[in-house]
Amino acid sequence: MLNIGLSGSTGKMGETILERIDKFKDCKIAAKFNSTNNLDDLDNFCKNSDVIIDFSTPEILEKLINYALKHNTKLVIGTTGLQPQHFKLLEKAAQTLPVLYSANMSIGANLLSYLAKEVTKILDDYDVEILETHHRNKKDSPSGTAVMLAETIASKKGLNITFNRGNRLRSEKEIGISSLRGGNVHSIHEISFLGDDEIITLKHEALNKNSFSIGAIKAAIWLQDKPSALYSMQDIYKI
């Protein structure tokens, strides 16, 4: 039986994972950590877990990683809003532990990223813009998924990523990200390739959080026999 520790257990993603875990055989939620806990509780939390699924806040990541290293606990990180210093921590931890990070764990969003990469090879001279839409209460902007998509495309085309263009003209070597917040929209990401004569748009819409939670649980199971490295969901889906 795979013992999964769930960090952020009282958040929306945590609650969805708790609802979906019974759909999977040979794994269970063995430990929980949430905002009511003290950071030192992460010690026993990691000790009692084979792998941790983390949907909490960036502020606890360093402590979580330290205790995971202490107890050799594998990590699946889905927390968004991470900064460069957090990614350095993940890269360092991945030298000792198998670590999987993804801003979006649904197969649809990762397929969108793959398709965007393939389209970019063909539409090399098209302008690229990303529009992401989420519910009114989402804290981070742009979304982690939008940044993931932009980085995928930018790396292939040698573009700079622009979050807030304001009133300046669009430069030739950039990809822009625009954000909408409102209503109870779960997640919509659109990538537009804009040419002089036509526009091609790739779109993914999540109707609920189920696809994210299922992806996270699959990631925890998949990670069990993997060597130390930093993985993504595209390693699981082989895309």
Swiss-Prot record:
Biological process according to GO: diaminopimelate biosynthetic process; lysine biosynthetic process via diaminopimelate
One MF term in the entry's GO annotations: NADP binding
Catalytic activity as recorded in UniProt: (S)-2,3,4,5-tetrahydrodipicolinate + NAD(+) + H2O = (2S,4S)-4-hydroxy-2,3,4,5-tetrahydrodipicolinate + NADH + H(+); (S)-2,3,4,5-tetrahydrodipicolinate + NADP(+) + H2O = (2S,4S)-4-hydroxy-2,3,4,5-tetrahydrodipicolinate + NADPH + H(+)
Highest taxon of the lineage: Bacteria
Entry function: Catalyzes the conversion of 4-hydroxy-tetrahydrodipicolinate (HTPA) to tetrahydrodipicolinate.
NCBIfam families in the cross-refs: dapB (TIGR00036)
Family per similarity comment: Belongs to the DapB family.
Protein name from the UniProt record: 4-hydroxy-tetrahydrodipicolinate reductase
Organism field: Rickettsia peacockii (strain Rustic)
Gene that this sequence comes from: dapB
